[in-house]
């Protein structure tokens, strides 16, 4: 029987890329499965890039215009996605038109963590919904636990606990979780209500595909398998590695990679902060002082902070000579490079990279682990404060730049991290025989095994396909 799944990712490029990677793996594992990815497009550039990534004729794309301008707040984005339900409904109806020859059997929707309103459309078609959770299982566990406490009326007003030493027992962690490490989105009653509503919808699904590895987050996956939560499928690490060994047309990127090839193994610290990471002039100066004093070789992907990262991405500095400490380029000319945008995966793959200073986004974290590069985490927004705690305190797979950083770029909060704090983190990160480096190498091997035949990712994907097929058979007997 030919079956069809409909994937609905959020418009964020990192979510789109992870969705495409998982969809490709699923269709490769079952010849009777087809997938249509419905892309909510605000950018023709992102859309054309995504649709060019696959040549499989059982993986198709349906583009839905999100309008002329992307909403500039997450809550507005949620409302906007809800308004697109009629367009999604029409697209799916055409897809499974029973009057067409060889029309597939619609088996379900796989919705992004920020597209849960599309569960309503799946219900209209009488098919199950599954959640694709692009972040880590630990944070998913925290979110579900907070929702449980909220509904039981057993939750604090967390906005008052920012400077307290209160710790929360989170079932997806083995260590008590300090509320100082709680992302700021939970410390606003309005935002808390939004995410609690999302978590309730997570529980309505038939299963949750999580971008993680059992050997990486055993405690979190144990919690998610307790029977009160939809089945979790650890399908990670989902990584887009197609650009690792490609020849770059871009001259600057080629020069960067050649420079790395000339450096000793594990000698370069790489600083890169994702698609939304940018810094003020004052913070740039502090970081430059740290790199100067550390004495390490470095590759620094540096961009200017955006006043609203949902409205416009970080930009490039045009006056670095004026911003950086006097003589910085002269003193570091033989051991460092300051660049703009960077091809992160291709750089992490280079043997010269010995450490990665990162915002701790989950995609970046998995890429770093894949290549066996230890991280120093500097969380900037969203769930990254939790990621930092899990990676540093819970798992021993990273070092910290600043404990309990009080900034959040999404909410317009900032706090300067001093040169001394950054330098200390870099020196700790670049220790060649550290326990963190040894642990990262061990987990890196396990991440590679996860993607091999019979590994945890393949097992989870096959189990998911089996469950989807069985759910169809069950629904047919019920009807």
Curated annotation (Swiss-Prot):
GO terms for molecular function: UDP-glucosyltransferase activity; UDP-glycosyltransferase activity. Keywords: Glycosyltransferase, Transferase. Its EC number is 2.4.1.-. One of its GO terms (biological process) is abscisic acid catabolic process. InterPro entries: UDP-glycosyltransf_plant, UDP_glucos_trans, UDP_glycos_trans_CS. Optimum pH is 6.5-7.0. Pfam families: UDPGT (PF00201). Signal peptide: none annotated. CDD domains: GT1_Gtf-like. Glucosyltransferase that glucosylates the (+) enantiomer of abscisic acid ((+)-ABA). Is not active on structural analogs with alterations to the 8'- and 9'- methyl groups. This is UDP-glycosyltransferase 71B6. It comes from Arabidopsis thaliana (Mouse-ear cress). The gene is UGT71B6.
């Amino acid at each position: 029987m030919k079956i069809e799944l409909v994937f609905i990712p959020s418009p964020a490029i990192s979510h789109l890329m992870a969705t495409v990677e998982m969809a490709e793996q699923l269709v490769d594992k079952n010849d009777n499965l087809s997938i249509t990815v419905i892309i909510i497009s605000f950018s023709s550039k992102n859309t054309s890039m995504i649709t060019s990534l696959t040549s499989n004729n059982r993986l198709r794309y349906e583009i839905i215009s999100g309008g002329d301008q992307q909403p500039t707040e997450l809550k507005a984005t949620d409302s906007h996605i809800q308004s697109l339900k009629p367009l999604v409904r029409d697209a799916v109806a055409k897809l499974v038109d029973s009057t067409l020859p060889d029309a597939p059997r619609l088996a379900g929707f796989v919705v992004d963590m920020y597209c849960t309103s599309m569960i309503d459309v799946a219900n209209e078609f009488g098919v199950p919904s599954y959640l694709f959770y692009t972040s880590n299982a630990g944070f998913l566990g925290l979110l579900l636990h907070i929702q449980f406490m909220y509904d039981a009326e057993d939750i604090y007003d967390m906005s008052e606990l920012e400077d307290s030493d209160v710790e929360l027992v989170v079932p997806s962690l083995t260590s008590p979780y300090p509320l100082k490490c709680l992302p700021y989105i939970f410390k606003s009653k309005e935002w808390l209500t939004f995410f609690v509503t999302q978590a309730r919808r997570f529980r309505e699904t038939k299963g949750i595909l999580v971008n993680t590895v059992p050997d990486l987050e055993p405690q979190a996956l144990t919690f998610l398998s307790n029977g009160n939560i939809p089945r979790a499928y650890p399908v990670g690490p989902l990584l887009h590695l197609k650009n690792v060994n490609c020849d770059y047309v871009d001259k600057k990127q080629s020069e960067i990679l050649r420079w790395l090839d000339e450096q000793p193994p594990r000698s370069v610290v790489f600083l890169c902060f994702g698609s939304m990471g940018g810094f003020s002039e004052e913070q740039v100066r502090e970081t430059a002082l740290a790199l100067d004093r550390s004495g390490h070789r470095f590759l620094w992907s540096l961009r200017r902070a955006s006043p609203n990262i949902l409205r416009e991405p970080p930009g490039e500095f045009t006056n670095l000579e004026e911003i950086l400490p006097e003589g910085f380029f002269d003193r570091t000319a033989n051991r460092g490079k300051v660049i703009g945008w960077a091809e992160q995966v291709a750089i992490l793959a280079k043997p010269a990279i010995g450490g990665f200073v990162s915002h701790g986004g989950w995609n970046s974290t998995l890429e770093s682990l894949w290549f066996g590069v230890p991280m120093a985490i500097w969380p900037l927004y969203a769930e990254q404060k939790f990621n930092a705690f899990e990676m540093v305190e819970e798992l021993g797979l990273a070092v910290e730049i600043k404990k309990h950083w009080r900034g959040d770029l999404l909410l317009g909060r900032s706090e300067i991290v001093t040169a001394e704090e950054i330098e200390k983190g870099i020196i700790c990160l670049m220790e060649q025989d550290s326990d963190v480096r040894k642990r990262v190498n061990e987990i890196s091997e396990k991440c590679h095994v996860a993607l091999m035949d019979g590994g945890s990712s393949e097992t989870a994907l096959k189990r998911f396909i089996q469950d989807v097929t069985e759910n169809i058979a069950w629904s047919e007997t019920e009807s």
